[in-house]
Amino acid sequence: MARIAGTELAQVNLTQGNTHLPGILVRYEPAQGVQPAPVVFDSPHSGYDYPGDFDHVVPREVLRRAEDAFVDDLYEGAPGAGAGFLKALFPRAYIDPNRHEDEIDSDMLSEPWPRPVRVTEKSEMGLGLIRRLIKGRVHIYDRPLTVGEIMARIESYHRPYYAELESMLDARVATYGAVWHVNCHSMRTTGRQQGKSIPRDDFVLGDREGESCDPGFTEFVAARLKDMGYSVQINHPFKGAELIERFGRPLEGRHSLQIEVNRGLYMDEDRIEKHDGFGELKRSIDRLIAEICAFANGQIARP
């Protein structure tokens, strides 16, 4: 599935049910002739189409460290297995689809935010809706941003992504009575704990401690990954953020699960290039996608 980039804001239809908003997102529906499943995968952080008004002062190669690079390539087989697939084209460093639109870092504003600010651990770290910092303490901008600048990003990028994902989920609930949403991310090979570098597992699944999806779905995905030989953690160190919190309502048949994959399995983090492990991981992800679709179809078929 080819990467698509552009700067126009006009909608372009690809094939029936598919949508391309240049520079913003691409939506893929199940391939023709494939049994559809009540499943949607989304990749909000793999975009690399940097807008012309992104007035950053750090080099592009530094900004790219914020990307979940190639995650969209890992999950591009979803439509062929019967699932919907949505990916952002804009970069996470420009505006983060996995943050609430009021999750604002007030330190980077030239004027007060017009609504109550949602203060979170991430926003206080400079990693809110609009990133202030990259690589720990490196400032992305050399000036404060205006409310108008941020609102333009929200209206042109953040809200369209949410609207498209919501429509995909709603359509499946209307058809099947339930939907299984998989929010796809990648994580650094190591994390920090008490000042020490700690190797991370192959996968981390997040369901916000059982609040965003039925624990049985989380356990199913964890078991499938372990069967393939991968190490898996659940809700540690990532339990999921805004997207699965917003859309995961398991009591209403709306199940949202976040999946983080260790970048060391498939890419060189310094060069931001795929390595020889990409193919093997892609085959595992394809198998996982098929098993998730079969799981979901089995759930809606139960009396």
Annotate the PLM regions.
Residues 2-181, 186-255, 261-303:
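N-terminal catalytic or cofactor-binding beta/alpha core of small enzyme domains
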